[in-house]
UniProtKB/Swiss-Prot annotation:
Region span, Disordered: 137-158, 197-217, 380-414, 794-852
GO cellular component: extracellular region; plasma membrane; S-layer
Protein name in the entry: Cell surface glycoprotein
GO biological process: cell wall organization
Motif interval(s): PGF sorting signal: 852-854
Source species: Haloarcula marismortui (strain ATCC 43049 / DSM 3752 / JCM 8966 / VKM B-1809)
Amino acid sequence: MTNTKQKINAVFLSALMVMSVFAAAVAFSGAAAAANRGAGFTYSTGPTDSNGGGNGDSVGQVGPGAVVFQGEEDLEDGGNFGSNTDIGQLQKVSGDNSGILLGNPIPQDQPTGSYTFDGNSGTDGVTLQTPRVTSVEVQNGGSGDVTGSTLQTSSSGPDAFVRADYNFQEAEDLEITVEDENGLEVTNEIVVQKTGLPTADRNNDNGASGSNGDFDVGWELDTTDIDEGQYTITVEGTEDLTFGDASETVTVNITSDQQASLNLDNDEVVQGENLQFNVENSPEGNYHVVLVESSEFRDGITADQASRIFRNVGDVQEVGLVDNTGPVSASTVASNVGSDQEVADVTRYAYGVVEIDGGSGVGSIETQFLDDSSVDVELYPASDSSNDGYASGGSHASSVTVRDTDGDGTDDSEDAIVTDLLETDDDQSFDVVEGEITLDSPSGAYITGSQIDVNGTANQGVDQVALYARDNNDYELIEIDGSNTVSVDGDDTFSEEDVVLSQGSKGGNSIVSLPGSYRIGVIDVQDADLDSDGTVDDTLTTSDFNSGVSGATALRVTDTALNGTFTTYNGQIASDDGQIDVDGQAPGKDNVIVAFVDSRGNAAAQVVSVDDDDSFSEEDIDITSLSEGTVTAHILSSGRDGEYGDTGTSSDSAFVNTIETGYAGGSSTGDQVREQILANTVDDTASDDLIVNEQFRLTDGLTTIESVSSPVEANGTLEVQGNTNRVPDDNTITVEILNSEDESVTVESTDEWGSDGQWSVNVDLSDVDIEPGNYTVEADDGDNTDRTSVTVVEAGSLEEEQPDTETPEPDTETPEPDTETPEPDTETPEPDTETPEPDTETEEATTEASGPGFTAAIALIALVAAALLAVRRDN
């Protein structure tokens, strides 16, 4: 029984296996048929490939040289791939994944590249690519791209298209799917059936309509009965290729509203900032006019500036001005402006024409030419009808032209501007608030005549600023390096370096040339041109200055100053050197004069420049033309007026020549030359000159030895000190130790000493083979010498005498016994020399035992000593 049951089970299982194999064969053939590559016009919502219907190459077979795509399934071997007839066994040729099998179906992430039957380049195989829908565009009836934007509903049948490019035409068709904003598929309702077939295939399907244009494929849309809202359009492969880049989704807003809208980026801007705006909800390719009335213009602007209120950027195609005759050039407006008129008095509007491109029209407004108030921007409708008389097609400015409204056959000032006859599509307002300008420098204190940096910050849109100073009344212009204005850089900062505020021909320069406390400010050039002549005004009232975009700060102006010193050595300059150094500070000056006068009336002078930090320094000034003796040295400054005394001379070099060849050119004594210098500078009438006076001796070079550390041990250090009037660095003092035969034992030197002329040299004898004895120390500066003697003793001998110097303490500790016995010391000198020991012993005993009972013992000893002394006296 068991045997029979097992046999029945075996037969049953065998039958199942046969049926399953048959079913698999049927399923495979069905799938292959369903996966024909690019097969046909069976897809009512998509095109066929370029091979055309019924072409055998468009079925699922793939032969050598074919292009296949990631994600394709059920490919058939349609050619000879060498010994391997299974396409899935093709091997990758090169790269990191060389040798891997292609697979069938092909994985969606299979590495792209060449695959051949043996994995070698040049043999039979296929090329694997990534399937891509490269572009999807929704277009209106005017072929304008409204992808992601607005598509107006049609009133006369199909008038919109979806067009696409893709790269897998050889594999399968594209399919379009449209969903409304609720996710409901409405493809059949909006897509015209069988549209967008490539031109070569149109004759194969009489139901095809529409055009693919410059794209690979196209579908025609009929929006006549479509609800308003946002629609999502997906274009992808019809079967296998619906993933990744093979699927592309876009959106479009379908609306029946014919009224455009205007959106501003901000509802408040600082005067000078650019304000961006967008014209939306209008068909692609339309033109709209935007206007700002002339009453919004800023006072003082030029006609050219007014014509640029709407910037010619983005989608703006045209900008300009409108008067009662229509569009008018800026030059004509400028000629029409009277002496007491503003540009706003002879114009109606500033306008811009904006094209709808890519779903919207983008423009920008230059707010620096608008008043700081609330500004209205008006948007007018667009039309394709030439009879409407406003912007359309190439006639961009037609909405601001004049229409013959009085019927006299002439467009003139008696007629109306077209925009006056139209209702606006939209209007928006924004507030222009006054900006700020900050003056960072100068501020605080300023020394008249000195160089200073002028810098600060300004709001966006301020191109130039002007600097003004105020004493008690109006603001007066400050000229800066010959210019009345300072440019503002792209980062909204302005800067001028090394400016002398007191130099210039304007009233502000004159104000800051005198000491005092003032206001200094900076203002937008636009607000400083009150008469609109294109240049800033020399004078502004406080009200005019404060009402503009401006900023001010306090400035304290101080007078020029002078201080300095000459470098001498021990109050002298050696005639052997014939040079002297000077340094100091002269804030507010570019140059000073240094002058020298000797007792015989000779003079030497030269100009010394002052650095940006107000300091000056000059080395090696030549004074060899002066006679030895007392010399006076002077530093001269021409003061804040830049003129020496009342001479009318402002040239430093000219005054130097006057000193050397005028005052010192005759038989004048030194005092007379000095009197002339003073009389024509600091002592002159109403002079503001400054002077620094010093005195030194010009004499022969001299170097002396003042002290040596003698005696010195043979292994010790000899310290030599002295004075000199020579200039360090340029001279060297050499110290040499000479033996009794004037032979050199060792040499040291120095070239460093201070203005007191004191020099010092240490001579190390530890490494010198020198015997105890007397030697000569010589100091030599190259021109002058001085000598002194020194004693060298045995090494360590000075240290042996050290105990003698260490015994002062015992002497100071026993003063009382010495003072109590003066008479015995003088009368009996011999016993005195014998008695110190008992005294010191008694002292020690006293300090060592100071308890009760010792006092009586000491007294007894004292009595015995007194008795003995009396006996000795009797003898």
